[in-house]
Amino acid sequence: MVSVQLNDNESIDKMLKRFKKKYERAGVLKEFRKKAYFVKPSIDDRLKRSRGKRRAQRANEERNS
């Protein structure tokens, strides 16, 4: 669980900004979306492989640029 304390002389906007950063880094929303519905293991593996291929292609394009 992500928690943030309000520091002395800190505005609520800054505290919210810190909370949002911690929330994103913790991957709470990403995990929630991932578990929102069931994905068969075979489809999950297929998606992981396709993501890896795209990542490798982008890395290869960056090296060649």
UniProtKB/Swiss-Prot annotation:
It comes from the Bacteria. Keywords: Ribonucleoprotein, Ribosomal protein. Residues 48-57 have a biased composition (Basic residues). It holds the Pfam family Ribosomal_S21. GO terms for cellular component: ribonucleoprotein complex; ribosome. One of its GO terms (biological process) is translation. GO terms for molecular function: structural constituent of ribosome. Residues 44-65 are annotated as: Disordered. Belongs to the bacterial ribosomal protein bS21 family. NCBIfam families: S21p (TIGR00030). HAMAP family: Ribosomal_bS21. This is Small ribosomal subunit protein bS21. It comes from Prosthecochloris aestuarii (strain DSM 271 / SK 413). The gene is rpsU.
